[in-house]
Amino acid sequence: MADRVYNFSAGPATLPFEVLEQAGKDIVNFKETGSGLIEISHRSPEFIEVIEKTESLVRELLEVPDNYKVLFLQGGASSQFFMVPMNLLGAGKKATYLNTGTWAKKAIKEAQLFGDIDVAYSSEESIFNHVPANDAYQVAEESEYLYFASNNTIYGTQFETMPQSKKMLVADMSSDIFSRKVDVSKFGLIFAGAQKNLGPAGVTLVIIRDDLLEKTPAHTPTMLSYKTHADKGSMFNTPPCFAIYVMGEVLAWLKNLGGVEKIEEINREKAALLYSQIDASDYYRVHAQDGSRSLMNVTFNLPTAELEAKFIAEASALQMKGLKGHRSIGGCRASIYNAFPREGVVKLVEFMQVFAANNPA
């Protein structure tokens, strides 16, 4: 579509255009029912088919083992910051956390309300410009789990390989789920807000190993218990129907593209185009250290804040939107999630070359 902009925003993010087109039709008349998708009952056969299709695609594309439940919850990924320890930590129990950015730090704060939290590593002193190697921290022997955020949108860092531990892994994959291959069997729990790679805000995907459902303390509020939602197929109460529907459509698009293996190849190519341009010039500099660079969020600076402001304004005028960095570190950020088109990255790279030539430091 000619008048669509390139949306480099960290989220909500670009969705496949064909998904938007289909959603536009289905929101008016879903499957010739005479009702819009957001009007039909969540107990209707039509919506049961939607949620079952979406779960099936999650399982297929991520190769989720049979001994895991797939849940579609509300409250955003931020609610998982307290739901995880509320469900997995009993009185007097300990968990280990890696502090690699704002969202991990928020999760640590919430977890401290429920148990003894050991922060085994923090990159805060270096403005979260890297994630740790496996030998840079130790997981407490008595820990119930090791928690980390696989990708950090604000700082543009990502675990190139997932942490290794004898302890159960718990991961916030909100900004890179389905972007690369992941061995789900290595994790006790994975969660992800939808608005980066999966659809609109409103639904949070949780993948949890069956045995953990029995660990929930008896005093846990009903709505905050994973077991409640697992037992009811994510329909203890009315689920976020539209967000689940869009997730299913996005995953169907991903499957038709070639699945996670193919999108990882595409994502690596897009990121390489952008990082190569930055590395080839002294004009731009990446915030993240080598070995920690994100495939999803490329954060970079120009020589001065004034040039950054001009860069963002001129890019916006050329239909490249959302390049302003997070307020906590400034600079620029190009978020290039799964559905972000390669031609948008090429256009940005070409603009970066022209801008540097026309605006010497």
Curated annotation (Swiss-Prot):
Cofactor(s) recorded in Swiss-Prot or TrEMBL: pyridoxal 5'-phosphate
Gene Ontology MF terms in the entry: O-phospho-L-serine:2-oxoglutarate aminotransferase activity; pyridoxal phosphate binding
Annotated positions binding pyridoxal 5'-phosphate: A77, S78, W103, T153, D172, Q195, N237, T238
Free-text comment on the cofactor: Binds 1 pyridoxal phosphate per subunit.
Keyword presence, Thylakoid: no
Residues the record lists as binding L-glutamate: R43
Keyword terms: Amino-acid biosynthesis, Aminotransferase, Cytoplasm, Pyridoxal phosphate, Pyridoxine biosynthesis, Serine biosynthesis, Transferase
Modification N6-(pyridoxal phosphate)lysine occurs at: K196
Reaction catalysis annotation: O-phospho-L-serine + 2-oxoglutarate = 3-phosphooxypyruvate + L-glutamate; 4-(phosphooxy)-L-threonine + 2-oxoglutarate = (R)-3-hydroxy-2-oxo-4-phosphooxybutanoate + L-glutamate
Subcellular location: Cytoplasm
One GO location term (cellular component): cytoplasm
A Gene Ontology BP annotation from the UniProt entry: L-serine biosynthetic process
Main location: cytoplasm
Metabolic or biological pathway: Amino-acid biosynthesis; L-serine biosynthesis; L-serine from 3-phospho-D-glycerate: step 2/3; Cofactor biosynthesis; pyridoxine 5'-phosphate biosynthesis; pyridoxine 5'-phosphate from D-erythrose 4-phosphate: step 3/5
Xref: InterPro entries: Aminotrans_V_dom, Aminotrans_V_PyrdxlP_BS, Pser_aminoTfrase, PyrdxlP-dep_Trfase, PyrdxlP-dep_Trfase_major, PyrdxlP-dep_Trfase_small
EC number: 2.6.1.52
Source organism, top-level taxon: Bacteria
Subunit organization: Homodimer.
UniProt function note: Catalyzes the reversible conversion of 3-phosphohydroxypyruvate to phosphoserine and of 3-hydroxy-2-oxo-4-phosphonooxybutanoate to phosphohydroxythreonine.
Family matches, as PANTHER family: PHOSPHOSERINE AMINOTRANSFERASE
Similarity field: Belongs to the class-V pyridoxal-phosphate-dependent aminotransferase family. SerC subfamily.
The protein, known as: Phosphoserine aminotransferase
Species of origin: Desulfotalea psychrophila (strain LSv54 / DSM 12343)
Gene: serC
